[in-house]
Curated annotation (Swiss-Prot):
This is Importin subunit alpha-6. InterPro entries: ARM-like, ARM-type_fold, Arm_3, Armadillo, Importin-a_IBB, Importin-a_IBB_sf, Importin_alpha. One of its GO terms (biological process) is protein import into nucleus. It comes from the Eukaryota. GO terms for molecular function: nuclear import signal receptor activity. SMART domains: ARM. Residues 7-46 have a biased composition (Basic and acidic residues). Residues 1-58 form the IBB domain. The keyword Transport applies. ARM repeats lie at residues 109-149, 152-191, 194-234, 236-275, 278-317, 320-360, 363-402, 406-445. One of its GO terms (cellular component) is cytoplasm. Keywords: Nucleus, Protein transport, Repeat, Transport. The lineage of its organism: Eukaryota, Viridiplantae, Streptophyta, Embryophyta, Tracheophyta. Residues 1-69 are annotated as: Disordered.
Length: 538
């Protein structure tokens, strides 16, 4: 078999793409990579509906237009309920609004669309201004909260009726239950879409929301306010950082809560705020959240662990100094634990992605990864992990070969990285193949340097190890790959580290043409001599 470049390779040289370089080693999160984000809490609870329990302020059934009746029957009463809302009688207003609230709070399939289509929403919104009638404000806020838990069209009706500024005003109500219900409603509106979120923020909701976090807040308020705060920070395009960064001091305090729901939503909020430029990352670091986030890597609940890991992963996409802030907070033992124990695929994948951004740092940071004992478990995942995990683990190893010194690369080889790297070469993901080739090339460079120093005789031992791992055949096969970047990288490696061996085989062969230049092509047994200038295919 000839390991020289094929004729196809020569034709394609002019379309060569630049391979992975040092600047690409540290990666921001790619949208198509973020499977971990698709957990139930993250995707399904952008909105929440309040069901029909009875807090102290909830109106008790009196002249109840809706309670204990089938939905169809209750819908038949909707005109009577609308008449009650539009009445001048305070008691009828309250009871009708409470009836709508109960109708919208049933457990399954609440008739939100039917209520919206009845045209009653703007009238209920007006009740939010009734500072003289706190109970009516509460019932109206609850009903509107549940309408806002519906479709985007439902939420648009709430916004178009002018409810958002009124909800923001209610955050200053003397009634904690009214304030909490307003918090919930704003969370549902903001959770609908980035456009709705930005509308809420434009109504100066952030500072009023942050005022709800104090030492006397009830747990239910803390839970709702933290969830709403996370909705204020989430979504792409991202909200204006000048508005959302004001939440950082509160989020730092919330991270020390013992409540799982509060911890979960506070951590998600931080993950959104840390997803961006180095300037944003630095602002998050300056808030002092890293030590507690590192502690949360050991939290027993995945719902807390996942966003904490996500935030740490975002921070290490920053520069070396920002990455060092994570390392210095003892994050590496926590990441090692995630690799070694029986966590689900998405967590291991995220941990590998985080480590890959640390190994994209300087040599001392790579050394700290080595000293933490992370490399062998990482290589183990490269050997036996699911493919989605391998895709991230190979980045971690390849980045270490790119930024590591010769001794560090020799250590990687001693830990058994060559064979699993070679095993990834036939994989269908071009990016993974490219990154794998980069890692192998960096290893081969060290092997060549050792040979030139006379430490390994006349042999590049790492080239031999790659050949023993069936890597040479796989690299040679990549010359026919459809991706220019891959096959050019394969050609470069073959020319640099195996061409001499191939030439010796040609020269020593019994039927080798006498005058074919080393850059020519061998076609098998030939008795005729080639032209001294090589074959002309023009």
């Amino acid at each position: 078999m000839s390991y020289k470049p094929s004729a196809k390779t020569e034709v394609r040289r002019n379309r060569y793409k630049v391979s992975v370089d040092a600047d690409e080693g540290r990666r921001r999160r790619e949208d198509n990579m973020v499977e971990i984000r698709k957990n139930k809490r993250e995707e399904n609870l952008q909105k929440k509906r309040r069901e029909g329990f009875n807090p102290s302020m909830a109106s008790q059934p009196g002249q109840d237009f809706s309670s204990s009746l089938p939905t169809e029957t209750r819908l038949e009463n909707i005109q009577q309920m609308i008449a009650g809302v539009m009445s001048e009688d305070r008691d009828l207003q309250l009871e009708a609004t409470a009836s709508f609230r109960r109708l919208l709070s049933i457990e399954r399939n609440p008739p939100i669309n039917e209520v919206v289509q009845s045209g009653v929403v703007p009238h209920i919104v007006q009740f939010l201004s009734r500072d003289d009638f706190t109970q009516l404000q509460f019932e109206a806020a609850w009903a509107l909260t549940n309408i806002a838990s519906g479709t985007s069209e439902n939420t648009r009706v709430i916004i178009d009726s002018g409810a958002v500024p009124l909800f923001v005003k209610l955050l200053s109500s003397a009634s904690e239950e009214v304030r909490e219900q307003a918090v919930w409603a704003l969370g549902n509106v903001a959770g609908d879409s980035p456009k709705c979120r930005d509308h809420v923020l434009s109504c100066e909701a952030m500072m009023s929301l942050l005022a709800q976090f104090h030492e006397h807040s009830k747990l239910s308020m803390l839970r709702n306010a933290t969830w709403t705060l996370s909705n204020f920070c989430r979504g792409k395009p991202q909200p204006a950082f000048e508005q959302t960064k004001a939440a950082l001091p509160a989020l730092e305090r919330l991270l020390h809560s013992t409540d799982e729901e509060v911890l979960t939503d506070a951590s998600w909020a931080l993950s959104y705020l840390s997803d961006g430029t180095n300037e944003k990352i630095q602002t998050v670091i300056d808030a002092g959240v890293i030590p507690r986030l590192v502690q949360l890597l050991a939290h027993p609940s995945p719902s807390v662990l996942i966003p904490a890991l996500r935030t740490i992963g975002n921070i290490v996409t920053g520069d070396d100094i920002q990455t060092q802030a994570v390392i210095s907070s003892q994050a590496l033992p926590g990441l090692l634990n995630l690799l070694k124990n029986t966590y689900k695929k998405s967590i291991k994948k995220e941990a590998c992605w985080t480590i890959s951004n640390i190994t994209a740092g300087n040599t001392s940071q790579i050394q700290e990864v080595f000293q933490a004992g992370i490399i062998r478990p990482l290589i183990n995942l490269l050997e036996i992990g699911e493919f989605e995990i391998k895709k991230e683990a190979v980045w971690a190893i390849s980045n270490a070969t790119s930024g590591g010194n010769h001794d560090q690369i020799k250590f990687l080889v001693s830990q058994g990285c060559i064979r699993p790297l070679c095993d990834l070469l036939p994989c269908p993901d071009p990016r993974v193949v490219t990154v794998t080739l980069e890692g192998l090339e960096n290893i081969l460079k060290v092997g060549e340097a050792e040979k030139n120093l006379g430490n390994t005789g006349n042999d590049n031992l790492y080239a031999q190890m790659i050949e023993d791992a069936d890597g040479l055949d796989k690299i040679e096969n990549l010359q026919s790959h459809d991706n220019n970047e891959i096959y050019e990288k394969a050609v470069k490696i073959l020319e640099s580290y195996w061409a001499a061996d191939d030439e010796e085989e040609d020269i020593g062969g019994v039927d080798a043409p006498e005058n074919v230049q080393s850059s020519g092509f061998q076609f098998g047994n030939q008795s005729g001599n080639a032209p001294t200038g090589g074959f002309n295919f023009g």
